[in-house]
């Protein structure tokens, strides 16, 4: 039986490949594929913003090598940044129960 972290890694990889390669390179997300992934898999990230300028900024920030596509490494960096933001948010929350030392 897979452990929760192993399952999470599987979801990260399989979600990328679910959307990549529908058009063009099967190992990269183009703009359309990325927008579909974010809209369906991370709806709270984009929120109600559906304007093209906001999405273009997200794409530009993710596309570190400026090839107009997001490869798996760029996708993982993006997810890592989201995870760090979530962690920082929860660091400010008091524990409900004292932590064991």
Curated annotation (Swiss-Prot):
<comment type="subunit">
    <text>Homodimer. Interacts with PPFIBP1 in a calcium-dependent mode. Interacts with PGLYRP1; this complex acts as a chemoattractant that promotes lymphocyte movement. Interacts with MYH9; this interaction increases cell motility. Interacts with Annexin 2/ANXA2. Interacts with TP53; this interaction promotes TP53 degradation. Interacts with CCR5 and CXCR3. Interacts with FCGR3A; this interaction inhibits PKC-dependent phosphorylation of FCGR3A.</text>
</comment>
<dbReference type="InterPro" id="IPR018247">
    <property type="entry name" value="EF_Hand_1_Ca_BS"/>
</dbReference>
<dbReference type="InterPro" id="IPR011992">
    <property type="entry name" value="EF-hand-dom_pair"/>
</dbReference>
<feature type="domain" description="EF-hand 2">
    <location>
        <begin position="50"/>
        <end position="85"/>
    </location>
</feature>
<dbReference type="InterPro" id="IPR013787">
    <property type="entry name" value="S100_Ca-bd_sub"/>
</dbReference>
<dbReference type="Pfam" id="PF01023">
    <property type="entry name" value="S_100"/>
</dbReference>
<feature type="binding site">
    <location>
        <position position="74"/>
    </location>
    <ligand>
        <name>Ca(2+) 2</name>
    </ligand>
</feature>
<feature type="binding site">
    <location>
        <position position="33"/>
    </location>
    <ligand>
        <name>Ca(2+) 1</name>
    </ligand>
</feature>
<dbReference type="GO" id="GO:0005615">
    <property type="term" value="C:extracellular space"/>
</dbReference>
<feature type="domain" description="EF-hand 1">
    <location>
        <begin position="12"/>
        <end position="47"/>
    </location>
</feature>
<dbReference type="InterPro" id="IPR001751">
    <property type="entry name" value="S100/CaBP7/8-like_CS"/>
</dbReference>
<keyword id="KW-0479">Metal-binding</keyword>
<keyword id="KW-0539">Nucleus</keyword>
<dbReference type="GO" id="GO:0005829">
    <property type="term" value="C:cytosol"/>
</dbReference>
<dbReference type="InterPro" id="IPR002048">
    <property type="entry name" value="EF_hand_dom"/>
</dbReference>
<keyword id="KW-0007">Acetylation</keyword>
<dbReference type="GO" id="GO:0048306">
    <property type="term" value="F:calcium-dependent protein binding"/>
</dbReference>
<dbReference type="GO" id="GO:0005654">
    <property type="term" value="C:nucleoplasm"/>
</dbReference>
<feature type="binding site">
    <location>
        <position position="69"/>
    </location>
    <ligand>
        <name>Ca(2+) 2</name>
    </ligand>
</feature>
<dbReference type="GO" id="GO:0046914">
    <property type="term" value="F:transition metal ion binding"/>
</dbReference>
<feature type="modified residue" description="N-acetylalanine">
    <location>
        <position position="2"/>
    </location>
</feature>
<feature type="binding site">
    <location>
        <position position="63"/>
    </location>
    <ligand>
        <name>Ca(2+) 2</name>
    </ligand>
</feature>
<dbReference type="GO" id="GO:0042802">
    <property type="term" value="F:identical protein binding"/>
</dbReference>
<keyword id="KW-0106">Calcium</keyword>
<feature type="binding site">
    <location>
        <position position="67"/>
    </location>
    <ligand>
        <name>Ca(2+) 2</name>
    </ligand>
</feature>
<keyword id="KW-0964">Secreted</keyword>
<dbReference type="GO" id="GO:0005509">
    <property type="term" value="F:calcium ion binding"/>
</dbReference>
<dbReference type="GO" id="GO:0043123">
    <property type="term" value="P:positive regulation of canonical NF-kappaB signal transduction"/>
</dbReference>
<keyword id="KW-0963">Cytoplasm</keyword>
<comment type="function">
    <text>Calcium-binding protein that plays a role in various cellular processes including motility, angiogenesis, cell differentiation, apoptosis, and autophagy. Increases cell motility and invasiveness by interacting with non-muscle myosin heavy chain (NMMHC) IIA/MYH9. Mechanistically, promotes filament depolymerization and increases the amount of soluble myosin-IIA, resulting in the formation of stable protrusions facilitating chemotaxis. Also modulates the pro-apoptotic function of TP53 by binding to its C-terminal transactivation domain within the nucleus and reducing its protein levels.</text>
</comment>
<dbReference type="GO" id="GO:0003779">
    <property type="term" value="F:actin binding"/>
</dbReference>
<feature type="binding site">
    <location>
        <position position="28"/>
    </location>
    <ligand>
        <name>Ca(2+) 1</name>
    </ligand>
</feature>
<protein>
    <recommendedName>
        <fullName>Protein S100-A4</fullName>
    </recommendedName>
</protein>
<feature type="binding site">
    <location>
        <position position="65"/>
    </location>
    <ligand>
        <name>Ca(2+) 2</name>
    </ligand>
</feature>
<dbReference type="GO" id="GO:0048471">
    <property type="term" value="C:perinuclear region of cytoplasm"/>
</dbReference>
<keyword id="KW-0677">Repeat</keyword>
<feature type="modified residue" description="N6-acetyllysine">
    <location>
        <position position="35"/>
    </location>
</feature>
<dbReference type="GO" id="GO:0042056">
    <property type="term" value="F:chemoattractant activity"/>
</dbReference>
<dbReference type="GO" id="GO:0050786">
    <property type="term" value="F:RAGE receptor binding"/>
</dbReference>
<dbReference type="InterPro" id="IPR034325">
    <property type="entry name" value="S-100_dom"/>
</dbReference>
């Amino acid at each position: 039986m897979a452990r929760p972290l192993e399952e999470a890694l599987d979801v990260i990889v399989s979600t990328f490949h679910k959307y990549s390669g529908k058009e063009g390179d099967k190992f990269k997300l183009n703009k359309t594929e990325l927008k579909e992934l974010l809209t369906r898999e991370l709806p709270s990230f984009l929120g109600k913003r559906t304007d093209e300028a906001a999405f273009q900024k997200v794409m530009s920030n993710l596309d570190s090598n400026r090839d107009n596509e997001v490869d798996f490494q760029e996708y993982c960096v993006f997810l890592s940044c989201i995870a760090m933001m979530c962690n920082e948010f929860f660091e400010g929350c008091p524990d409900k129960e004292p932590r064991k030392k």
